């Protein structure tokens, strides 16, 4: 096999934020912004990243962390070797239009992309679910980021014009059609999520502790009555998760009924719950949500971990650019960050 090219999408989470680490419900979609990897077999690893304008070379017996983008590649190689797959090196380049650090899962997109390149080059025949789990393991155990399964699952299982309703405990999922005349306006605030890793870890710790106190395996099993048994801060945070799980189910039903106005209202409610009770928003994300609603969006909320990164708004397809331009103009007049927006739609998952 000579050179192959793999397209690996980013993802947006429509609803179900901060629920995946308590095995709750999520509703992500793969989006039409991609990491593109072109590569061939090689006796070592030699990869050029267009984004970083940097080439890295190493051998398979030297999988030590460097604290840079190449760790995602090393993590995938490490996990494949650990699992007993017979692989060699690769030589190629990484390009694409998926922005990094914008809360659109560029890391999961990159990991799954590299995994798929190796899967193709070395005929590994890895099934889709295994791909998502291996990429997650690489990020958790090698790179050292305690993410849930949401991102990798969306990148692998994405389907054009559909969102994915996923139970992160059983990994059972369902495709739900997304209206073709509605666009997802993704607004990158330009705020780097420096807080995200420490605060995310803290939210995760409190959520996991809450499950232990209640003797439950998943947030799906937790009732209003159970919440009374938790200490005040745990109760405040965990009650958000319980409400968010319920909202994912409501959005699923509203999408099936074609009620985009109801979907929008639920998204906006979710944002203010994240802001006021889970405390993961920031002034810039709140500004976007308010402006989007003023300009006629169906609904808007932060997407991803929060503390910066990106927010989304559901808008009529033919108004997306007008609304995006107007928000960006007002945002740049108020804040000094380098913000930008993208108009995306649900797309297929990773593929050649």
UniProtKB/Swiss-Prot annotation:
One of its GO terms (molecular function) is galactokinase activity. The record marks 11 as: Transition state stabilizer. Keywords: ATP-binding, Carbohydrate metabolism, Cytoplasm, Galactose metabolism, Kinase, Magnesium, Metal-binding, Nucleotide-binding, Transferase. InterPro entries: Galactokinase (IPR000705), Galactokinase_bac (IPR022963), Galactokinase_CS (IPR019741), GalKase_N (IPR019539), GHMP_kinase_C_dom (IPR013750), GHMP_kinase_C_sf (IPR036554), GHMP_kinase_N_dom (IPR006204), GHMP_knse_ATP-bd_CS (IPR006203). Optimum temperature is 90 degrees Celsius. Pfam families: GalKase_gal_bdg, GHMP_kinases_C, GHMP_kinases_N. Mg(2+) binds at residues 107, 139. The active site is at residue 151. Its EC number is 2.7.1.6. Substrate binds at residues 17-20, 200. The keyword Protease does not apply. Optimum pH is 5.0. Belongs to the GHMP kinase family. GalK subfamily. Catalyzes the transfer of the gamma-phosphate of ATP to D-galactose to form alpha-D-galactose-1-phosphate (Gal-1-P). Is very specific for its substrate, since it is not able to use D-glucose, D-fructose, D-mannose, 2-deoxy-D-glucose, and D-glucosamine as substrates. This is Galactokinase.
């Amino acid at each position: 096999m000579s050179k192959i090219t793999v397209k690996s999408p980013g993802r947006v989470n429509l609803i179900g934020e901060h629920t995946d680490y308590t095995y709750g419900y999520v509703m992500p979609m793969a989006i039409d912004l991609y990491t593109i990897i072109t590569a061939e077999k090689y006796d070592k690893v030699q990869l050029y990243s267009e984004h970083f304008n940097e080439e890295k070379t190493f051998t398979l017996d030297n999988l030590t962390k460097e604290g840079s983008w190449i760790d995602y590649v090393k993590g995938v190689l490490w996990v494949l070797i650990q699992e007993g797959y017979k692989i060699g090196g690769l030589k190629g380049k990484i390009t694409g239009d998926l922005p990094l650090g914008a809360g659109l899962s560029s890391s999961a997109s990159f990991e799954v992309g590299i995994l798929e390149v190796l899967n193709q080059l070395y005929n590994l025949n890895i099934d889709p679910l295994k791909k998502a789990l291996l990429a997650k393991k690489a990020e958790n155990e090698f790179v050292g980021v305690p993410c849930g399964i949401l991102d990798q699952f969306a990148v692998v299982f994405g389907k054009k014009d559909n969102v994915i309703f996923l139970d992160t405990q059983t990994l059972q999922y369902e495709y739900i059609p997304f209206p073709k005349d509605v666009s997802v306006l993704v607004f990158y605030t330009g705020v780097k999520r420096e807080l995200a890793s420490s605060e995310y870890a803290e939210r995760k710790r409190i959520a996991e502790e809450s499950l232990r106190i209640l003797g439950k395996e998943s947030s799906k099993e937790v009732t209003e009555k159970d919440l009374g048994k938790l200490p005040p801060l745990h109760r405040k945070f965990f009650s958000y998760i319980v409400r968010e799980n319920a909202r994912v189910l409501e959005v699923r039903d509203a999408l099936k009924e074609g009620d985009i106005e109801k979907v929008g209202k639920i998204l906006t409610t979710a944002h203010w719950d994240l802001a006021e009770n889970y405390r993961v928003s920031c002034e810039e994300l709140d500004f976007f949500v308010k402006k989007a609603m003023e300009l006629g969006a169906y609904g808007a909320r932060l997407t991803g971990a929060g503390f910066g990164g990106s927010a989304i708004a559901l808008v009529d397809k033919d108004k997306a650019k007008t609304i995006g331009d107007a928000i960006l103009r007002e945002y740049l007049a108020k804040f000094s960050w380098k913000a930008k927006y993208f108009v995306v739609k649900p797309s297929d998952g990773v593929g050649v």
